[in-house]
Amino acid sequence: MFWRLRARLSYAVARRLMGWPWMVRQPRSWAWMQGQFSRMAALGDVGAQSFYGHLLLFRGQGFGAREEGLRLLRLAAAAGDHKAAYQVGVQALKGDTRHAADAREAARYWGQAAEAGHPLAARKLGELYRSGGPGLEPDDAQAERYETRARQLGL
């Protein structure tokens, strides 16, 4: 019980320290902060999984950082985090050297994010359905539906 409280408090302090650029530039403090993000994500906190997944995806160092970031983002998306779902959709459509671009998977994640209220996901999904993509045929009805949803959400 005590270790969970300690993990939450340490995570809150680490998130607060992210606002201080000079602290992020210090190797020891950065390593400590990453440890707190990792521990909280490993405990199953959806917000921490999303945050640390984004951090590893865009700023991670090492061979496995990108894959670990995507794994954490997928876990957060499965738990309902719309920002993580949007980013997993972007990465699915982009593809990489080991995985081909998959528009169907991108549409699934963007659909989840759009239904949760992510306006950019709705717009991108409308564009994807309008033009089609790798493994996804164009569908004007779905495109219109998601373009309308994007307008409702403010885009």
Can you say where each PLM-predicted feature lies in the sequence?
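Inter-repeat boundary and helix-capping residues of tandem alpha-helical solenoids
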Residues: W3, Q26, W30, A42, ...
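Structural signature of tandem alpha-helical TPR/SEL1-like repeats
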Residues: R25-Q36, Q61-L72, R98-Y109, L136-E147
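TPR/TPR-like (Sel1-like) alpha-helical repeat modules
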Residues: R104, R108-E115, R123-R130, E137-L155
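Alpha-helical segment of the N-proximal tetratricopeptide repeat
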Residues: L9-R28, W32, Q36-R39, L43, ...
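Hydrophobic face of amphipathic alpha-helices that form TPR/SEL1-like repeat modules
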Residues: R15-P21, F51-F58, Q87-G95, K124-S131
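Short helix-capping/linker turns of helical repeat alpha-solenoids
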Residues: S10, L43-V46, F58-G60, A79-H82, ...
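Canonical positions in the second alpha-helix
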Residues: S38-M40, R74-A76, G111-A113, R149-A150
